[in-house]
Amino acid sequence: MDTSEARNRKVVAVEQFDLEVPETAHQISSDSWFQVAFVLTTGINSAYVLGYSGTVMVPLGWIGGVVGLILATAISLYANTLIAKLHEFGGKRHIRYRDLAGFIYGKKMYRVTWGLQYVNLFMINCGFIILAGSALKAVYVLFRDDSLMKLPHFIAIAGVVCAIFAIGIPHLSALGIWLGVSTILSIIYIIVAIVLSAKDGVNKPERDYNIQGSSINKLFTITGAAANLVFAFNTGMLPEIQATVKQPVVKNMMKALYFQFTVGVLPMYAVTFIGYWAYGSSTSTYLLNSVSGPVWVKALANISAFLQSVISLHIFASPTYEYMDTKYGVKGSPLAMKNLLFRTVARGSYIAVSTLLSALLPFLGDFMSLTGAISTFPLTFILANHMYLVAMNDELSLVQKLWHWLNVCFFGLMSLAAAIAAVRLISVDSKNFHVFADV
């Protein structure tokens, strides 16, 4: 028995042999690394980028925000490469995050990982619905000031559109041309936000960059912003995305990750820094609410943000859709009547619940903080480092082992602190605003 076989036998405990990993009803191993890179870049430059000036830079200031974003980029790339390198660990492909965790740890961690991932993706999708609703409301107030339509109404409309799109696109690889559309939409709202913010910044030289609030409030908002930093760069579904890439899967995924964390982050950096430079501590959590300019330009940007949020939600909901399709044995043509009806009921119900929660508590920054705290930190940093430590234990030096344990402990503490801060933020906002608030 060679070292590799011994390691695999050591990792796969007896409990794991009772774990049945289902085949997938979705398409895998069909996409180029470049298409996968666009999926990742779509996630990082989704309409969420319009919130980072207000949810990251305002609480952290110039030094904390710039250094934090650069560090978050580096550590996120590192953590994602760890996960990507384990995709074929043990001589088989692990097309789901929970499959990889189950193979390494056993049945209990399979379930825990699926629970963490489900919460992560569910909350991200709630955020996309809030974003889409906010974008629609922003268009409405450009032309009407009667206040007849409130944010919850627009969130409901966004939910319906997201459900229709989910029914029409059967799986992640089927996005195809929609990824190109998403890129064009992202370019539109990012360019508009940058140009209008820069114009406002030039015309309004006086602004305040001081971090606002009391000492205790600053502590909680800074901690929450740290969770927003890691939320910005991580999908929480890397193995599911990697499952779509052609062989060689590790090499191609590494290309996609390097693209995401170099070329892909530049638009996000630009809109985040310029937005904060223009408006300082008064920057809105949805940047397009701060900009001034021609009505038709702002309407175009908001409509683009709305449509891009619909596409992005489908990406982050795909693991849940894959689970439902596989569990209930969906087979045959995606256009078959029974499959259309199944997607209508299953995906429609999922979107309906997400939409209800989004309308109930439409606090975008709080959602980002809580998601980063309770799921992004554990999935992307704690679990990734510990899985790599367990899987590659015999090949790591003492220094490397200590490094991974340091990451596990540090991000564990960060996750706990950020969760406390996020819950406090939600509690404060819930007192200041009623449910179904028009924020």
From Swiss-Prot:
Gene Ontology, cellular component aspect: plasma membrane
Pfam families reported in the protein's UniProt record:
Aa_trans
Q: In which tissues is it expressed?
A: Expressed in epidermal and cortex cells of roots. Expressed in stipules.
Where is the protein situated, by its record's location annotation? Cell membrane
Q: Could you state one GO biological process linked to this protein?
A: proline transport
Write out the transmembrane intervals. 32-52, 55-75, 121-141, 154-174, 175-195, 219-239, 257-277, 299-319, 346-366, 370-390, 403-423
Q: What is its main location?
A: membrane
Phenotype upon loss of function = No visible phenotype under normal growth conditions, but mutant plants grown with exogenous high concentrations of D-proline show reduced inhibition of root growth.
Q: Which UniProt keywords apply?
A: Amino-acid transport, Cell membrane, Membrane, Transmembrane, Transmembrane helix, Transport
Q: Which GO terms describe its molecular function?
A: L-proline transmembrane transporter activity
Bilayer topology term:
Multi-pass membrane protein
**Induction record:** By wounding, drought and salt stress.
A further note on this protein reads: Treatment with toxic concentrations of proline reduces shoot growth and root elongation in wild-type plants, while plant lines over-expressing PROT2 stop growing shortly after unfolding of cotyledons.
Give a short account of what the protein does.
Proline transporter that mediates proline and glycine betaine transport. May be involved in the uptake of compatible solutes from the soil into the roots, or in retrieval of apoplastic amino acids delivered to the roots via the phloem. May be involved in delivery of proline to wounding sites. When expressed in a heterologous system (yeast), imports D- and L-proline, glycine betaine and GABA across the plasma membrane. Has the same affinity for D- and L-proline.
Q: Which family does it belong to?
A: Belongs to the amino acid/polyamine transporter 2 family. Amino acid/auxin permease (AAAP) (TC 2.A.18.3) subfamily.
Q: What is this protein called?
A: Proline transporter 2
Q: Which organism is it from?
A: Arabidopsis thaliana
